């Protein structure tokens, strides 16, 4: 009975979330991309670029793997939990990259420079400009926010600020649409929450 109630609660969220994403794709994404292109400044590009570098998944993967492996002999919670952080970034990143190739959505620069906005699903584009949906950086950003704040509670405000900042930077730099960031964030958060549930606190 409890499982059925939980499942129904989850399903209730699907419709509004799906509606929000659809509305963004239809009416929000392109106008926001055009506005960002017209109003881009040196400051916004500098901040966005800094967050872009911070959101590269290899930083988190390298750090979490290093801590996990270094402390593995002790077999304590710190090692295991950092490897779960590694897994959350790796798994969510793989999911996002698979969807990118399948979806075939052109990035904002193609819309602005060439007027190309139509998706080409199952066209198997391998070019960067056709891998807009979802945002891989947003996926990593939310993994940093959820798992980073769980591992380092005192740094939770920093982790959430950094994670959300990384996601928003994709819109600021005009390399992703709003809906790309929304879906990427949801993938990252969902996988990270699942991994967070497997964390242990024993020493």
Task: Cite the ranges covered by each PLM segment.
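Membrane-embedded catalytic cores of phosphoryl/pyrophosphoryl-handling enzymes
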Residues: 2-15, 117-203
